[in-house]
């Protein structure tokens, strides 16, 4: 795939399911995910191609990723137009996207899709994987979690999701359900809403959106202290903005402040709502807009349960002790055997206002199909906040109304997929509306400019790539064409070999002719 794009083939895809015998549901499910983030996506081949043939996980993954593909169609279409105009492929290798980062030169496990989405497809039997993020801020597509670039991270890769990260300063046109205003949800024809997914920039960044081959909107994201502004060079008609990974304290549209709501904005109202740190949902007034300014609010919550005291009924072996699920590591686990009495409880150390719990199960292992989550202020009197009745055994993200609690307990576990259950991580998160005492361990989004991984190092010894400015006749745009140095080297070597071969052939022909003439004379 990366070789195809480097050779100029921008429009490609795979026959999901294949013509050979797909071995199992996990391969098929991972293939679905990869196809979602390819220039075109289709199920095609021989044998059973229908997702429901491969079990509930595959079927549910197909449904969520089918709607995600529908969400992203405007962005994919725009990228295809850009590819046609400039030659810049829809899917790019990391080396092509970030030529200034030598660590990404040989990266084959991740790539950029439509310039804004870093995709790390899973090609092995894994529930977590390592990913190297270029400099700048990155936001998890599924959770909104902030990752600071320039480092390698061990990230979740449950069977129903592939790791995808949104780049800082992104402005992504999407279509979402007007009922939920969320990605991956079913879009009914009478409730489709055009929206923009945006992320806080590092310094300043521009994005082009081609709604058709002749109509272009340029969005500019620029940071100023703890505020950033998204401006358009022409009136934007999108009425919904999904600001990922942002807990906004103020939002202004064309300079006018919007009301902060305590609920998801309805179709007939304007305002903004902070959706538990995952994103801020903004519904703008009916009029077209040219600028939206977002002021960052409180800290982004980290896992309050990490390295906290955990109490449980038992554990199976020393290498699967219960402390493993709150140690912040993804390669340590806790396996529970006696489910009739299984529970675990985490002491947060102090009373917190929480509204989200995450329970992460190991793929292809036993998991908690049914269980309850309860909270307590004193460890004795418990209040149930969530009852899980049909978990799929991957990552369960459980949301509930904000509640004050010091202790969080998971109990009444029944197994799915075996007689034991294995957990590798447990998380508890503070509500976005919680008051803090200033000791929050969360992180603020740093929007300062970073060293640009997109810039080619100014050195004659660079083996990354050369950069030349090209003006294409008939196009109003000046764009940059990146030429892989190894392609040039191979071209030169190939040319030399071709010339040498031609010379050798000429010499050989002359020798044969000389021998023939000599024989005729004799």
Regions found by a protein language model. Give the residues of each.
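Aromatic, loop-rich ligand-recognition surfaces of beta-strand-rich domains
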Residues: 300-302, 327-386, 390-446, 466, ...
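Single-pass type I membrane-protein transmembrane alpha-helix
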Residues: 498-511
């Amino acid at each position: 795939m990366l070789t195809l794009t480097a050779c100029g083939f921008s429009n490609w895809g795979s026959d999901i399911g294949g013509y050979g015998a797909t071995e199992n549901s996990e391969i098929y499910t991972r293939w679905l995910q990869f196809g979602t983030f390819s220039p075109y996506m289709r199920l095609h081949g021989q044998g059973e191609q229908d997702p429901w043939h491969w079990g509930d996980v595959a079927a549910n993954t197909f449904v969520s990723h089918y709607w995600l593909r529908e969400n992203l169609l405007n962005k994919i279409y725009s990228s295809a137009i850009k590819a046609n105009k400039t030659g810049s492929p829809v899917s790019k290798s990391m080396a092509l996207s970030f030529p200034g980062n030598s660590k990404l030169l040989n990266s084959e496990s991740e790539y950029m899709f439509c310039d804004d989405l870093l995709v790390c497809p899973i090609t092995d039997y894994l529930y977590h994987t390592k990913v190297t993020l270029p400099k700048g801020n990155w936001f998890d597509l599924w959770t909104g979690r902030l990752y600071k670039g320039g480092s390698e991270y061990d990230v979740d890769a449950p069977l129903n999701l592939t790791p995808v990260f949104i780049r800082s300063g992104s402005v992504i046109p999407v279509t979402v359900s007007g009922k939920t205003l969320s990605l991956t949800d079913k879009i009914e024809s009478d409730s489709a809403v055009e929206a923009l997914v945006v992320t806080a920039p590092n310094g300043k960044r521009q994005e082009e959106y081609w709604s058709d081959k002749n109509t272009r909107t340029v969005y500019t994201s620029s940071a100023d202290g703890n505020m950033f502004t998204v401006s358009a060079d022409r009136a934007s008609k999108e009425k919904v903005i999904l600001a990922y990974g942002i807990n906004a304290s103020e939002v202004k549209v064309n300079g006018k402040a919007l009301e902060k709501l305590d609920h998801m904005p309805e179709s007939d109202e304007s305002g903004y709502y902070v959706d538990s740190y995952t994103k801020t949902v903004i519904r703008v007034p009916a009029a077209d807009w040219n600028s939206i300014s977002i002021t960052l609010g409180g800290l982004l919550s980290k896992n309050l349960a990490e390295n906290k005291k955990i109490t449980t009924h038992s554990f199976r072996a020393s290498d699967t002790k219960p402390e493993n699920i709150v140690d912040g590591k993804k390669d340590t686990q806790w396996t529970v055997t006696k489910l009739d009495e299984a529970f675990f409880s985490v002491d947060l150390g102090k009373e917190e206002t929480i509204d989200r719990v995450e329970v992460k199960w190991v793929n292809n292992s036993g998991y908690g199909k049914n269980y309850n989550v309860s909270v307590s202020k004193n460890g004795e009197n418990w209040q149930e906040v969530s009852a899980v009745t049909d978990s799929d055994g991957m990552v369960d993200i459980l949301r509930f109304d904000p509640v004050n609690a010091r202790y969080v307990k998971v109990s009444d576990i029944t197994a799915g997929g075996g007689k034991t259950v294995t957990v590798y991580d447990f998380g508890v998160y503070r509500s976005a509306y919680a008051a803090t005492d200033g000791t929050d361990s969360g992180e603020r989004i740093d929007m300062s400019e970073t060293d640009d991984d997109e810039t080619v190092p100014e050195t004659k010894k660079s083996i990354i790539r050369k950069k030349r400015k090209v003006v294409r006749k008939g196009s109003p745009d000046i764009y940059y064409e990146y030429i892989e140095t190894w392609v040039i080297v191979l071209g030169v070597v190939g040319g030399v070999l071709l010339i040498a071969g031609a010379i050798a052939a000429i010499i050989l022909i002359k020798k044969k002719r000389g021998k023939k003439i000599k024989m005729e004379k004799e």
